[in-house]
């Protein structure tokens, strides 16, 4: 199963969700792939310092994270898409109505 977390710039919320999910998956020996992207990500920004500090409290890291723009390929490959806010979800489903079944 492949999970995709989506927010605005992929430097905070979705990046943190990815890092924490990857840690939980590894710690529990689960078989999931995890990715994150931003609706308006520029593709070259690091995670915010606050996001880095927040995930470090839980033993995860964002030191190597670089923002990733959302692509149709990422959307089509994901089994489940988690939008970080109701507005992100609304924009996703309005733009790609076929996502309504796998996005929340």
What is each of the regions a protein language model found here?
Residues 1-77:
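Conserved active-site segments centered on acidic
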Residues 13, 83-84:
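Small/polar loops that bind or transfer phosphate-bearing groups
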Residues 80, 86, 90-104:
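Phosphate-binding/catalytic loops
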Residues 7, 82-83:
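Hydrophobic structural packing positions in well-ordered secondary structure
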